[in-house]
Curated annotation (Swiss-Prot):
NCBIfam families in the record: rpmH_bact
GO MF term set: structural constituent of ribosome
Gene3D superfamilies from the UniProt entry: 1.10.287.3980
The encoding gene: rpmH
Annotated organism of origin: Shewanella loihica (strain ATCC BAA-1088 / PV-4)
Record-stated family: Belongs to the bacterial ribosomal protein bL34 family.
Protein name (database record): Large ribosomal subunit protein bL34
Length: 45
């Protein structure tokens, strides 16, 4: 039997998908901009 691949960690989640992580790169800023334009309630993790 194989182990479950999803091992949740809030720290890892924030570091890779958080708002500050998004704003650190050009691509991430584009992600935030797209989500703002779409009207998402949550912009990032």
């Amino acid at each position: 039997m194989s182990k479950r691949t999803f091992q949740p960690s809030n720290l890892k989640r924030k570091r890779s998908h958080g708002f500050r992580a998004r704003m650190a790169t050009v691509g991430g800023r584009k992600v935030i901009a797209r989500r703002r334009a779409k009207g998402r309630a949550r912009l990032s993790a």
